[in-house]
Amino acid sequence: PKMRKFLIALPLILAAPLLAQQDAAPQLPGVADAARVAAGTYAVDSRHSQVNWQVNHFGFNDYFGLFGDIKGTLQIDPANPAAAKVDVTIPISSVATSSQGLTDHLKTADFFDVAKFESARFVSTSAVVDGQKAVIKGDLTMLGVTKPVELETRFEGAGNNPMNKKATIGFHAATTLKRSEWGMTKYVPM
């Protein structure tokens, strides 16, 4: 038992000099500082934006997926962030999971019906800002049905992007949907 404790503590002892030698952490280009937000219209960076999702699989476990190639805009004025406008289009055919069979099934009429509905779209209607967080209300159109949703949003950072040299801002947003409200009723409720 004493040897085990020693072996666990040893990496911590060896790491201490390394930690002590480090200077201040390097400054990232994006910092969660609202003063760095420039007013204007921002285009969604389709290469670095995605919608991640998870769904419970019959009470056994969760599985996960994503949509990529997101397009859209954010209009924002840091002097009046509550007036921000978001308009985002999600190409449904970009749905991806770790299983090709599941991905293919999700594209059928049982779920997203990509042959009939190419995209989903979120358009904001209001924003309530509280520091680094906001509740963004809007309408989500999916499978030809439009319903209101609320996005719990967190400001992540602003600054000049070193890759494209443009002013860039980043956010995370989360919501919970009841898919049957958009007509996706296969295997509901189970």
Segments predicted by a language model, with ranges:
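Positively charged n-region of N-terminal signal peptides that target proteins for export
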Residues: 1-6
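FAD cofactor-binding and catalytic pocket of flavoenzymes
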Residues: 9
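Low-complexity, acidic/polar, glycine-enriched regions of mature
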Residues: 21-190
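Hydrophobic h-region of N-terminal signal peptides that target proteins for export
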Residues: 12-20
